[in-house]
Amino acid sequence: MQLEKAKETKQDMERCRLLAQRIAEELAPATAAVLNAETPALEKALHRAGVDANPFTVAARQADLLVVEDPAWAEMPAQLPGQVLLVFTGSNVAEGWAEELARRGYYRDFRWRSRGRAQQAALY
């Protein structure tokens, strides 16, 4: 059981590292807010990639990028930063996020594609 848990944790850390590296290289945000993270792995990976990342709070609303892990289980905040990245950890269902983001004037950037071993994500 512990071996299985350790393997899962290692895979999660690698997934977060790859995603953080891609975010830092392609989007280059100075700051990022992470919403709905079960563990701080993505925040830590973003820090290592050179992005000032913190959990989403009222004070973090001024971030350049909002990263939402597993949007099916997160409620959309009233105020959003300039870019929103939906990261699908369990399912790829955004549960109304796409429609609400469109109503608020956000449109999907189809140049951002999910690649290889990196997890599925959608940039708005």
Residues covered by each model-derived region:
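Conserved SAM-binding loop of SAM-dependent methyltransferases across substrates and taxa
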Residues: 39-51
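Short acidic low-complexity segments
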Residues: 52-63
